[in-house]
Every structure is written in C-alpha cells, then in structure tokens.
UniProtKB/Swiss-Prot annotation:
Organism listed in the record: Zygosaccharomyces rouxii (strain ATCC 2623 / CBS 732 / NBRC 1130 / NCYC 568 / NRRL Y-229)
Gene Ontology BP annotations: amino acid biosynthetic process; aromatic amino acid family biosynthetic process; chorismate biosynthetic process
Gene it is expressed from: ARO1
Description of how the protein assembles with itself and partners: Homodimer.
The record's free-text note on cofactor binding: Binds 2 Zn(2+) ions per subunit.
Name listed for the protein in its UniProt record: Pentafunctional AROM polypeptide
Region Shikimate dehydrogenase, annotated ranges: 1307-1589
Compartments, record wording: Cytoplasm
EC number: 4.2.3.4, 2.5.1.19, 2.7.1.71, 4.2.1.10
Annotated binding of Zn(2+), by residue: E189, H279, H295
Stretch list, region EPSP synthase: 405-872
InterPro entries named in the record: 3-dehydroquinate_DH_AS (IPR018508), Aldolase_TIM (IPR013785), Aminoacid_DH-like_N_sf (IPR046346), DHQ_synth_AroB (IPR016037), DHQS/DOIS_N (IPR030960), DHQS_C (IPR056179), DHquinase_I (IPR001381), Enolpyruvate_Tfrase_dom (IPR001986)
Positions contributing to NAD(+) binding: 43-45, 78-81, 109-111, 114, 134-135, 156, 174-177, 185
C-alpha cells in the first residue's frame, strides 16, 4: 500500500497525495477551511460516480453545527467552460446567500478546476477554493499552481486569474473511473515533467510502460447504482491497484516537479514556462484538431517536434529523441500527426504549415511576433532556464516531411568538419541477435537508434530472448541474454515496418523459439513495401531443414507464420545467396543452436556482398563461436553447436554506408570531412568507398586504421569513374551515383560516363534503387542507363547544366521511395543545383525532397548534421498538393463484368467530366499489334493475358492517373492479384475505381448472345460469384445500372449517372439545407414494388430516408437495387441512408457490426447524400464510417424512446459533445414528450446548441409541436404511406399549416401582372402548390399594361406582397423599378419575376431560361453538355432566354436563324463574345458547317407557317441533329397548340425528340414558386393542374 504524502508549494504543504483518502480530504476541508458554507461544484458526469457520491455524503455528515453544504452541477465538456457558465455558478452562489467566508470545492478535471477556480478568484473579490482533481491531467498539471480561466470564442483560457487554492487534494483512487483514452492523455504531462526535470523518474517510467498499458487497456465499462437517484449508470473502471505503486509514484513525482517550478516562479515570468515544453507546437495542433484530439495527445506530438528542433539545432542527441519517442509510443500516445490511428481519430484533418505557424504566433510565451520554444538539452534537463527564440524556417523544417535544399554555395571551401555517423545498422542488428542468444550481460554502445533497431529490440523483448535496460542516459543498451533458453512465441504478430535486416534475421531466430502454453507459432509482418521484398530463398532453406513456415499473403514475402513446434534440425543446409547476404548471416548466427552442427553451403553462384558474411563470422567469434570456412567446398561454412558468451562491452562501429554521405559532401563541395571511427580495419565493406570511389574521382583521401578524411577538389572538377565493381559495398552505389552526376572530364568521346556494376541486389532493397536513381537523376537533367547488375551515369559537363526538377506546372519534388539511402544521397545532389549561378537570394529556387523522415531508418539526425554541422541552408515546405488548391483531374477506372454497362456509361462519364475515354482492351490490342484480345488468349492463354493486362494497367494508371481519363477495364482484370493490388492502391491514393454492376440474371442473358469476346471457360454465374468479392474490395465506388428497355428509361439512367459521377469526383457537393426543409421516411420492404407511388410520397421533400433496417433482405445486391430504384423514381432526390438498430427503435440486429459495416460500405460506394450514424454504435464503427465518408454527409443520431432523459439531462450534452468530436455534419436528437413542457425544454436546448445543424424533435402526440418548430430536415410522413415510421409524425402540409397558424409563415399575396392575363395559368400553377404544401399564400391576376400602376398599387401599396410574375407588355418597363437585377435578367434584357427584398426594395429575375433548361434536362439532355452546338429559331424576347439557357448548359456554339436576318445579327451582337452566338444568314453557310446540333429551341409563333427561307435553314440544321450521348432534342416555347408545325417537322421527318411548350410554362413557374417560398414544388401535381384542360 502506498503512503500518504504532502508536497510543499509556495512555502505551504497544501498538496496532499494518497490513495483512497476521502476521509483525510474531508477532515482537511473541515478543520483547515472553516466556513459557514461549503459549495461542491462538479459536472453532471461526475455526479454518477459512486466515489464522488460517497465523498459528498461523508463531507455532508461531517459538517460542524452551523455549517451547510451546497452542491451545483454544471454541464460537462470544454464547450461549457465559458463566461456564461461562470455567471450561472455565480448567480447560484448569490441566490443561496453565499458570502466572503464561502469555501468552494472544485471536484473534476481541468475544465472544472480552471473555471471554478476563476469563480473563486472573482466571487466576492476572492473566496477560498479547494481543488479535488479527478483526472490524471488535472492531478499533475491544471490543479497545481493557481492558474484559472474560462474560454472565449477567440481562444482557450484567454480570461482568467492566478488564484492559489487552499489545498489540492489528490486521491489517485479517482483514476479508477477515468476512461482509457483520458488516462493515456494525462500521461503526456507526466512524461513531460520527467523529461524536463527528472531523468531518474523518466527511467522509471520507461521501465513501467508495459505494465501501465496492460492495465489501462484492460479498462472496462461497469454498471453502478446512484445513491441518491437509484439510477443505473455506466462508468469506466480500471484496476488501479494492479499498478498502484507505479501510478502513485508517477502522480507524486510529476506534482513535485510542478510544485518546485511554481514555487520558484509563480507568475510564469521565466522558469515556469519550462513547463510548456511540447506546448508551443502542441497547442497549435490542438487548435486545429480539437475536439477530436485531446490536449495530451497534441502535447505528445508537440514534444517530439520540439525535441527534433533541439536535435536540429545541435543541442539534443539523437538518442534522447529516440528515448522520448519510444516512451510516448509505449504509453499509447501519438508521436506524429500522420500516424494512421491518430489520423483516423482526427478524421483525416489536415494541419497546414501556415496555420500551425499562425497558431504558434499567439502563444503566451512569445515576445510579440517572436516565437519562443522550450529547448531540451537531455532527458531530465532543459537548455537554459526559460524558453528560447526560434525562427520560422527551423520550425517549418521540423513540422513537415518535405524539405527544401538550397544551393551549398554558402559553404566556404576551406571548411573542415568532423562528423560521427550513427552506429552501423548491419552491426547493430547482428549485435542484438548475438547478445540475445548469448549468455550474460553485454553493454552495447553506439547502437543505432533507428526504426530498424527499434523493431529488433521490440522483437527480442516480445520473444523473451533477453532483458533490456539502458544506461548513460539512454546512450548504452544493457542486454542480459538468456542463452536462447527463454525464447517463447509471442501472442501478437511482430510488426517490423520496412526493416529488411530485422525480418531476415528474425525468420531463422523464430525457428529457435519455444511454444507458449497458448501458441505454437510466430508471425512476422511489416508494411506494404516489406510485404513485397523477397525472403523466399531463406524460407525454402529453412523448410528443407524441417521448419514449417507458411506465407500468409504473397508467396516469397512477409507476412510469415513460423511454427515453433518444428525444430531447427541443422546438419547440411543449402542456401541460395545471390540476392541477399542477410539470408546467410541469419542462418550463420542461429546455427549454433540447431539440434545438430550446421554445414552451410551457399549455392547458385557467387554470393552477393561477401564482406557482410565475413562481418557476421568475425562478430560471432567475438561472442565465442568460431566458424570454419570449408577447405574443400567453395562458399561453405561449418558452424559448431554451442552457446554465445556475451562480452561485457561491445562498441558498434559507425555505419560505413552512412559515412559515405558526409564524405561525398566534401567531394562535391571541395571541403574537408573526417569520419573518426571508420578506417581500413572496419568490418564493413563500405569503408572502401573513399579509397576506391572518391580518390579516383579526384579527391584527396587519408585513411588510417580507424579514421577517414576526404578533401574534395575545386567544385565542379570531379572526374568520372570509368568502371567500378561495387559488389563489396552495394549500398554505397547511390552515393557514388550522385557524385558521378556532377563529374566530367575533357574527353569529348567519353560522355562523362561512370559505370557501376555488381549491385544487382539493390533492386530488391527498400525499393528498386537502380530504377529509383535513374528516375530521379533524370529530373536533374542527368542521363542514365540501367545495366543487368548496375547503372551508367552520364555526368553533366558543368554544374550550370544541373536542372531544377520541374515540369510544365512548375517545380516538382524528388521522390524518396520511403528509402533512407535514396533520400540522403539525393539531398547532396540537390545542393549542387544553381551552385555556381549568381542570383539574388530571393530568386534562388531550392530543390524539394519528399518524405525526408525516411532517413530515420539509419540516420534520424542526417538533416540536422547537414544543416547544423555541414552548414547547408534548409527549409520546411508545405506539400505541393496543399499549395496548388486545385482539384486534380483524377482519372476514373471502370471495372465490372461484361455487359455491366462499361461501354455506355464509360462514354457518358467521359462526356460529363470532359475526360478522355480509353478502353484498356483496345489499348492492349494496339500494343499487342497482332489482333484482338481473343487472338492473344488463343496464342498464349488466359494466365499470360492477365499478367500482361496487369502490367499495362499499372503503367497506364501511373502515367495517366492524374490526366483526366476514363479507363474502361476488362471484366477479368480483378482475376490477377497484382492487378487487384494496383486497383486498391489507386483507390487508396484518391483515385476513383468505380464498379459498374447490374442484375446478374440480365447479364447472363446478354453475355450468352455476345460472340465478339473470348468465351468464358466456365458458367457466367460462377465467374460472378468468384469475382464479386474482388470487385468489392478493389473499388471505392459502385453504381448499379438497371436494364433499360426504352429511351425514357435511358434518360433517367443517364441523369442519375450524371448526378452520381459528378458527386464522386467532387464536382457536386451536398449542401445541408439552411432553411426549413423536410425528408420523408420510407419503411417498405421492397421499393421496386412501390416505384410508381414514390413520386407522390416524396412530393415537396428535400430528401428521402430509406429505412434499410425495414427492407425484406439485407444482402448488398438487394440494397443496391433499392437505392437505384429510389434514385430513378424520385428524380435523384438526396437519400438519407438509415440503418436503425433495435435498441434505437429500429429492426436491425444490435450486435451485427459486420453486417452493419458491409451495408454502410454499400451506402458510401453508392455515394448517398446522408448516412444516419447512431451515436450508440461502437466507436470503431463510427470512426470507420467517418473516415471513409468521402462526399457523403453524416447525421449523428440519438433516440430516447422511453422518455428516460429529459432535455436537461447530461445524456444529451454528452451525446452532443460526442457528435462534435466525430465531426458529424448534422446532429439528430429524438426525445419523447410526456408533457408539453418537454417541447419548451427542447427549444431551450436547441437555442443553446448551434455549433452544428441540429434536428431536434420529440416523439408522440404531445411532441408534434416540436416537429413543427424544427427548422431543418424534419422527418415527415405522407398521406400516400400506409402508416408513419414514428409516433407523432406529420405530413409536410400539416406542419406548414400548423406553423402558419402560429405565425411562423406569414400569408403572402402574389400576382401575375400584364395585359392580357385573364387566361394566365399562373394562378392555377401557384395556388395548387400552396394548397398541396399547406402554405397560407394566394396567387391572383392583376391586369394592366402600365408599369407605373404596378409600382403604385402593388410594389408600394401591397404590404403583404410576396412576388410578381411579369408578362407582356411589362417585362422591360418594370425593370426601372428594380433595385437589383440578377445576371439572367441583365443579360437577357427582360424580366418575368419580381422578388421582394424588404424595405420596399425589389430584385428582378428571369426564370424563362430556367424553364427552358429544366424542360430539356428532364427529357434526357445532360445538365452540362460537351461538344454540342445549339440552335435557336427566332429572334424575339424568348430567344434571348433560350441563348442564355443553352450557354448555361454548355453549348460551345449557338446558332440563330430568323425570318429577318438583320434581327438575328442584332441578337447575336447583343450577347457577350464568349457565348459564341452565330447568325446563320444563308443556307449555303449552313451546308458548309461541320457541326452536330444536339439541342434546339423554337421561339417563333406557332400559329403561322414558317417562310420558305427560314424553313430551308431549319431543315438543314435538323438534318445535322446528332449526339451520341443523348437524343437530339427540340423544345417548343409556345404553350399552344400541343404539337406545333416545328415540332411535327423535327419529330416526324428528322426523328428528333420534341418537348411541348407546356413543360416550359410549368418549369418557369415552378422556378418562381421555389424562389418565392423557399419550398420544393410538387411538380407533377402542378403540371397536371396547369395542363388539365
């Protein structure tokens, strides 16, 4: 049991720390803070915690006579840490007669402590306060030191005071109920205080991380009974007692640090700002990522960034950064904003560099605009006594993963530097394996602290191979080996990142591992690249020797499952070693522990990298095992059985491969660099680099047994190396390549060629390094040629010829391929660009290196050395994608079965997006050049075709993925695993992979009659069933294309597909309504049976809800068909996809999370406009949907069917905060009204919660009024539905009538004005809409030919005027009375709509053009056309609206014909030039046109015959009617007769589709209706009413 401790602060022992000390806390308050009134303030969540209830009860029962206890609960969450909440508390205190002797007890986390402390500081000019912190963060940070504050809209903690509490009573028992994430969040501050002040405590924290995480991860939710209410509540429970000593100690030590610092600097003038380590950067991240990211999580990232800054400035060692990184990760905290789990948690939010710097600029530590950061000197010690000024350039560097390298021309040639590279990766990994297998304690010094060795150390610990501790402030690893006796299978897979060395060494080591009681295998896995790298020869060898190993994914690569029940037998082992020497070293090191002595024979030719094999043998000898080289067989070794004996100390040589970079820097810049611990006695082959590569190229090289010094020749005078065999030092070829790029001689015949060979293994390293260097050197203007086992580099003749990497759009980045050696070598070449050019500093363009952090694999501090020690000018850079701000034209890949519609929809897709269409089968046939796909299959077989098809797809999508193409792929592309990987990668990188599918029965019927394609070798249904899962896993979108049997159905499909494709490509965004709106709820089992009635059901709605849980079947194909049916039947009304679970009032099984995830995936691929996401679902389900939502909006919903939670209950506040943290787009709360006052409480809740659009309603008869008052997306029913989906639902008309009766909708009067208007259909049109929608308005006629009369009588004289429809002769005359004109009215030059703006101001509009457009688009013309010309017949007023409309549709040219040619010319000249209006003057002119006319609008009188000349022109144009994506369409502007002569001619003689003028009449009136009322018009009912006679 831990003891009770008191910690002094500011000269008083006022901080008490213990476990289960509530009695001591009560006595301290009663005895040392005597008062007539004690006030406990906590949040409503804490009121549910039994320990809080016990504490308050004990305090109440212990009160002395004459004292009273009050308790006040505030709403939880940062959103309530406001001046308003503070005022509420103060009003409560005043109402209860609290005076100056009041003692306030703040029980809670930092929010409560900060706010209640501020109340105490100001109430009655200051009253006493006792802090009782309940969160880890509050215990160790916010409760200590007297800082108090509330938030403001402009920032957190901007208003507050220093007010020291009487006591801080810290009982770690509170932590039992702290949620897991909050617990881990608090550890950031604990680690921070140890990091800046207490190195010993940091070490203790390091050694207890595993225990902490195990206990905290075991946190669970339990049910407890409330003492006062009897309610059963869910709370978190963590078994603190399982780590009590550690928890108590970490809290106590952290408090001691803060107390000591505060005592020295209470008001944060100097020393106290050291406590802000990690906060300068952390607060900037928090400002962007809140509320998804917690304070401690952001501070954790901030600590890493600020530590990296310290390292970058040459103050902090890389080892110390590594220790900090490890401990934060070990306690479950993020170490980078790019970690996948953290990105998912923060919903993929971006953290732009300029925003981070701007947020940092308002840090309280700053001096004006100068930023200050706490600099760490070592673990446990800060650099100086306060924060330091830092410049933006250095900050930008550490904040980004892209770096700008400026020319090295600032570096003086006489510069001489000594650089010590980190420990050798090769030696470090070997030493760890040998020491883990060895017996005894070994102190390993100069170990490389990198990703590779981190994975190796973790694996050794997971396999229980050794005990690992640290000395010398983390610089020395102390490894106590157990002689291989304790090796045990780990429960979890060993993740090795991209650590190739670790993966190969551990593969053989795993064969020595013992089975545990629960597991008899070890799984090795890694990242995506690691899962492509070869390990086959080693696995083959071990399998042959008796070890059972399974490939879990791809043959020949990780992940591997290595069975521990099959022993490593030993004896003769044959191994192919032409790919990697690491296979050899892996077997060599483990061979002494085989059952029998090992004879290792390397077969298949000369082994690669023999020197690394020699290195392993020498190191084995140091650990006590001597390997004998066979004298009778080449490349054969005899290894005896035995056990390694660990030497007391082993010093790792610096990495010779890494040493090549500073030495090459000297060579290229003409400076001098010494590497003091690598010479000719080195174990590493790369130590030869200076002698064998740099010296022949013109450098002065001095090498001793243990040091190497290089002095470069004058800059620009390096010589090519005609030929070098780099087989002994293959990793150094990249460095040699960049040196060769700037090498030239005076021999005109040599072409400055440097030939490097012996490096074939470099193709299977972290990337294909030979290809990577060839690709990236080309960006600098350096030519190369790949050789079978090497590369030729054609050096440039002058440094001036070295190019800045760029393309037609500007500078581009240098790719690193996630390869440390690629990045480091190319950083040297980058500094030589513009080296000798004299430009003003502002004009010098740097070279951008991408993924700079990949150097962490072997030299995390490389950039620090390049900048701080070698003097290079570096800067950080925002990723180019952030900077452009442009939408890229990401190509669309169509996949799916034959006959799924890829050809037709592919053509439509290309036209809608303006992309190029490319059929991959056609492209294949072009490249094959010997016939069709069918011919290729006949000659080579399907497997060869699939292989060739995969290569073609990879090359095509890599080259043209951003080029704006629609790629139509063959149905079987997904049959090939390589193709599937490329498809998935393209989708994950932001490309569109669209699966087109249709009913399989229809597909079978079609395919059985298609002779043009190679025949399936099996049943079509079997093919579909095999491929279906592949189509699903490879695609990120899916569209079901129903079979179309007539032109009308094709029109519906095309329109639906156009809406879909523009949505998934980001060209059409879902707009959440900001006005009164509604959606109808559908609960049918099968919509296909109700398709005919759906248009009536959704009348007047802004969206339609599909209750998927009510469907007859939940299979994906069925649900997809329902969505397709709904889209078609409702004219693509936005869909709300709702999967309501049983406990939230629906029918879907509560625990079927797999089925739920599958159906949400269907919805997201279908790009539904809204997904209803229940806030009670598991967090992983919620985050999966939130992180993959794409362009879909999320409605976060919560329902209370049992009337369990009044609107004041914290349940709603907690759910609201949860919805905010999920960053949903709309919040939907549904309560149940048991009394009318519940509706008033709901409205108060709505008024106080405006951060997000909120749907809030009460169910039941009493709650109907809440549906009327709800402002957006109100769920409604319809008179055409058999029943409503929820109790109390109303129709849209009912809602509007009730709302109008309450004064919510003011009755308006509307008129049609002009002369004559007696036969106008406008009153019928509008009044029908008002009646059906339940609106209180009335539309009438006002006949006059005087605009003046309209102004006096209606514009000035009618107070309830809602709008005017204007007809002849007033369309021009009334314009002078308008205060504003829309663009349409201005360009057309006439108006037909008056819109009141208030205060006797009016806007003039013209909806004729909308009527024209909607008449066309509702009959199959796309919303946007491409390569289509339009025709307008006539030159009157309607013709102007027609031209405006055709231009809006996208017609690239608009022809006008008219009886009087001069009128056509006059019309043409009145429009802007970009409209491209052409007056067709003669028939001969038309004959010579090479245009296809797709759309025509007839604006000539329908009651007169066309004159001969006009008719001749019209017929010529109609003859040119053609468009391959829609039927040529003519709209008649005249309302009567139903069929005009122009319509008859176009339809009967030229097969045009014709649209009667009544559609134009209704569409333009409906546009007016929606402008005036803001409501959706019931189009079909209005159309029927208008055209009835």
């Amino acid at each position: 049991m831990v003891k009770f401790e008191k910690v002094p602060i500011l000269g008083k022992e006022s901080i008490h720390v213990g476990y289960d000390i509530h009695t001591d806390m009560v006595q301290t308050i009663i005895n040392d803070c005597r008062s007539s009134t004690y006030v406990v303030v906590n949040d409503t969540n804490l009121s549910k915690v039994p320990y809080c209830q016990d504490f308050v009860q004990e305090l109440r029962s212990s009160l002395p006579e004459g004292s009273r206890l009050l308790q006040y609960a505030v709403k939880p969450g940062e959103a309530n840490k406001t001046r308003s909440t503070k005022a509420d508390i103060e009003d409560y205190l005043l109402s209860k007669g609290c005076t100056r002797d009041t003692v306030i007890i703040a029980i809670g986390g930092g929010i409560i402590g900060d706010m209640v402390g501020f109340v105490a500081a100001t109430f009655m000019r200051g009253v006493r306060v006792v802090q009782v912190p309940t969160s880890l963060l509050a215990m160790v940070d916010s409760s200590i030191g007297g800082k108090t504050a509330v938030d403001t809209p402009l920032g957190k903690n901007f208003i507050g005071a220093f007010w020291q509490p009487q006591f801080v009573l810290v009982d770690v028992k509170w932590l039992e109920t702290l949620p897991r994430r909050e617990f881990i969040n608090g550890m950031a501050e604990v680690i921070k205080t140890a990091c800046i002040w207490n190195g010993l405590e940091f070490e203790r924290l390091e050694s207890n991380a595993e225990l902490f995480l195990r206990v905290v991860n075991g946190s669970k939710v339990i049910k407890v009974n409330g003492l006062s209410t009897g309610e059963v509540n869910d709370i978190h429970y963590t078994n603190i007692e399982a780590m009590l000593e550690h928890t108590f100690k970490l809290v106590l030590e952290s408090i001691k640090v803060k107390a000591e610092v505060v005592s020295s600097d209470e008001r944060e003038s100097s020393l106290r700002n050291l406590l802000n380590f990690g906060h300068s950067v952390g607060h900037a991240y928090e400002a962007i990522l809140t509320p998804q990211a917690l304070h401690g999580e952001c501070v954790s990232i901030g600590m890493i960034k600020e530590a990296e800054l310290s390292r970058y400035l040459g103050i902090l060692s890389p080892t110390q950064v590594s220790r900090l990184t490890k401990i934060l990760a070990a306690y479950g905290l993020p170490i980078s904003p790019e970690e996948k789990w953290f990105k998912d948690l923060t919903l993929q939010k971006k953290t732009p560099l300029d925003v981070l710097l701007q947020k940092m600029s308002i840090d309280k530590k700053n001096d004006g605009s100068k930023k200050k950061v706490v600099i760490l000197e070592s673990i446990g010690k800060c650099y100086g006594k306060s924060a330091h000024y830092v410049n933006d350039e250095d900050l930008k560097f550490v904040l980004t993963d892209e770096t700008l390298v400026y020319p090295f021309s600032n570096i003086p040639q006489e510069q001489a530097k000594t650089i010590v590279p980190p420990g050798s990766k090769s030696i470090s990994n070997r030493a760890l394996i040998l020491a883990a297998l060895g017996k005894g304690t070994c102190k390993i010094k100069n170990l490389l602290h990198s990703d590779d060795t981190k994975h190796m150390l973790t694996a050794v610990q997971e396999l229980k191979g050794a005990s690992i501790t640290w000395e010398d402030n983390g610089e020395t690893v102390v490894l106590e080996g157990h002689g291989g006796e304790t090796l045990t299978a780990s429960a979890d897979p060993l993740y090795l990142g991209n650590a190739g060395t670790a993966s190969r060494f551990l593969t053989t080591l795993a064969a020595l591992v013992n089975s545990s009681s629960k597991q008899d295998y070890v799984v090795l896995t890694g990242n995506a690249r690691m899962q492509q790298r070869p390990i086959g020869p080693l696995v083959d060898s071990l399998r042959t020797n008796g070890t059972k190993i399974d490939y879990l994914k791809s043959e020949g690569s990780l992940p591997l499952k290595i069975y521990t029940s099959t022993p490593f037998k030993g004896g003769r082992i044959e191994l192919a070693a032409t790919v990697s020497s690491q296979y050899v070293s892996s077997v060599l090191m483990c061979a002494p522990y085989a059952e029998n002595p090992v004879t290792l024979a390397l077969v298949g030719g000369k082994p690669i990298s023999q020197l690394y094999v020699d290195m392993t043998i020498k190191m084995m000898e140091k650990f006590g095992i001597k390997v004998e080289v066979s004298t009778t067989e080449p490349y054969t070794y005899h290894i005896p059985k035995g056990q390694y004996t660990n030497p007391p100390e082993y010093i790792i040589e610096s990495d010779a491969s890494s040493a090549t970079y500073p030495l090459a820097f000297a060579a290229m810049t003409g400076t001098t660099v010494t590497v003091p611990n690598i010479g000719y006695e080195s174990l590493q082959g790369d130590a030869r680099f200076a002698i064998e590569v740099l010296r022949p190229m013109g450098c002065k090289v001095e090498q001793t047994a243990n040091s190497t010094t290089v002095t470069g020749p004058p800059t620009g005078s390096l010589r090519p190396l005609k030929h070098v065999d780099m087989e002994p030092m293959t990793d150094a070829f990249l460095t040699a390549s960049v040196v060769a790029a700037v090498a030239h001689d005076n021999d005109t015949d040599s072409a400055n060629v440097t030939t490097i060979e012996g490096i074939a293994n470099q193709r299977v390293k972290e990337c294909n390094r030979i290809e990577a260097m060839s690709t990236e050197l080309a960006k600098f203007g350096v030519a190369t040629k790949e050789l079978p086992d090497g590369i030729q580099i054609h050096g440039i003749n002058s440094l001036d010829l070295l190019q800045l990497p760029s393309n037609s759009t500007g500078p581009i980045g240098i790719e690193s391929y996630d390869d440390h050696r690629v990045a480091m070598s190319l950083s040297l070449l980058a500094g030589m660009v513009n080296y000798s050019k004299s430009h003003p500093a502002a004009d010098i363009k740097p070279v951008r290196i991408l993924e700079r952090r990949c150097t962490g694999k072997t030299w995390p501090g490389w950039w620090d050395v390049l900048h701080t020690e070698l003097g290079a000018h570096l800067d950080g850079a925002e990723p180019l994608g952030y900077l452009s701000g442009k939408k890229t034209k990401r190509s669309v890949v169509l996949i799916g079965m034959r006959a799924a519609g890829k050809s037709t929809l592919g053509r439509w897709c290309s036209q809608i997006l303006g992309y190029e269409l490319c059929d991959l089968d056609v492209l294949f046939e072009k490249q094959y050049a010997k016939g069709t796909v069918k011919d290729f299959v006949a000659e080579h077989g399907w497997d060869k075709f699939r292989e060739a098809e995969a290569n073609l797809f990879k090359e095509t999508v890599e080259q043209y993925g951003d080029g704006g193409y629609v790629f139509s792929a063959g149905g079987g592309l997904v049959e090939n695993e390589v193709s599937r990987e490329h498809l998935k990668k393209y989708a994950s990188d932001g490309g569109v992979v669209l699966h087109l599918h249709r009913d399989i029965e229809e597909t079978i019927v079609f395919l059985q009659s298609d002779p043009t394609r190679p025949a399936y070798m099996e049943e079509i249904r079997d093919v579909w069933e095999r491929r279906e899962k592949w189509y699903n896993e490879c695609s990120n979108f899916a569209f079901l294309a129903p079979h179309c049997s007539n032109e009308k159905e094709f029109q519906h499909l095309r329109k639906s597909f156009a809406n879909y494709i523009t949505a998934i490509t980001g060209n059409r965004e879902v707009q959440v309504p900001n006005k009164r709106s509604a959606f109808v709820c559908l609960t049918f089992g099968d919509l296909t049976e109700k398709a005919s009635v759906l248009p009536s059901i959704v009348r007047g709605c802004d969206a339609v809800e599909l209750r998927v849980d009510h469907l007859a079947k939940y299979d994906s194909q069925f649900v997809s068909k329902q969505l397709s049916t709904l889209r078609t039947a409702t004219n693509d009304l936005p869909i709300v996809f709702t999967l309501r679970t049983k406990k939230q009032g629906g029918k879907f099984p509560d625990e079927d999370y797999t089925g739920m995830a599958r159906l949400f995936d269907v919805a997201l691929k279908a790009c539904v406009e809204y997904i209803d996401l229940e806030l009670t679902l598991p967090i992983d389900v919620q985050y999966k949907v939130s992180n993959t939502k794409g362009y879909t909006k999320i409605i976060g919903s919560h329902h209370d069917f049992g009337a369990k939670y009044p609107w004041k209950d914290p349940e709603w506040e907690n759910r609201y905060n949860q919805a905010l943290s999920l960053d949903v787009d709309v919040i939907k709360f549904v309560g149940t009204a048991t009394k009318f006052e519940d509706n008033l409480a709901l409205e108060r809740f709505r008024e106080e919660h405006k951060s997000k659009p909120l749907i809030a309603i009460n169910m039941g008869e009493i709650g109907k009024i809440s549906r009327v008052l709800n402002p957006i997306l109100t769920p409604i029913t319809s008179e055409h539905l058999p029943n409503s989906s929820a109790p109390g639902q109303l129709t849209l008309a009912q809602i509007n009538k009730i709302f109008a009766s309450m004064g919510g909708i003011t009755s308006k009067k509307f008129f049609v004005v002009g002369n004559p208007v007696s036969h106008s259909r406008s009153p019928v049109l509008h009044n029908t809409g008002y009646k059906l929608n339940g609106l209180p308005h009335h539309f009438d006629r006002f006949e006059t030919d005087s605009a003046q009369v309209v102004k006096e009588t209606l514009l000035d004289g009618e107070p309830s005027l809602g709008g005017l429809a204007v007809t002849i002769p007033l369309k021009l005359d009334i314009m002078k009375y308008m205060n504003q004109l829309t663009d349409a009215a201005r360009v057309i030059g006439a108006m037909n709509t008056v819109i009141p703006l208030g205060n006797h101001h009016f806007k003039g509009d013209n909806t004729d053009w909308i009527g024209i457009k909607h008449s066309l688009t509702s009959n199959g013309v796309p919303e946007k056309v491409s390569n289509v010309a339009g025709l307008v017949i006539g030159a009157g007023g309607t013709s102007r609206a027609a031209i405006y409309s055709l231009h809006n549709l996208g017609c690239h040219r608009i022809f006008v014909i008219n009886r009087t040619v001069s009128k056509s010319i006059e019309l043409r000249d009145s429009f802007p030039q970009e409209y491209n209006v052409v007056a067709a003057e003669t028939t001969q002119q038309i004959d010579h046109l090479n245009e296809h006319i797709g759309i025509a609008v007839s604006c000539v009188p329908a009651d007169k015959d066309l004159d001969t000349e006009l008719l001749a022109k019209l017929e010529r144009f109609l003859h040119k009617g053609k468009h391959n994506s829609f039927v040529p369409t003519l709209l008649e502007a005249a309302y009567k007769p139903d069929v005009t002569p122009v319509m008859k001619l176009a339809h009967d003689k030229y097969q045009w589709q014709v649209v009667p003028g009544r559609e134009l009449l209704v569409h333009q009136g409906v546009a007016q209706f929606e402008i005036w009322t803001g409501a959706k018009a019931p189009f079909q009912e209005i159309f029927n009413a208008v055209t009835r006679d």
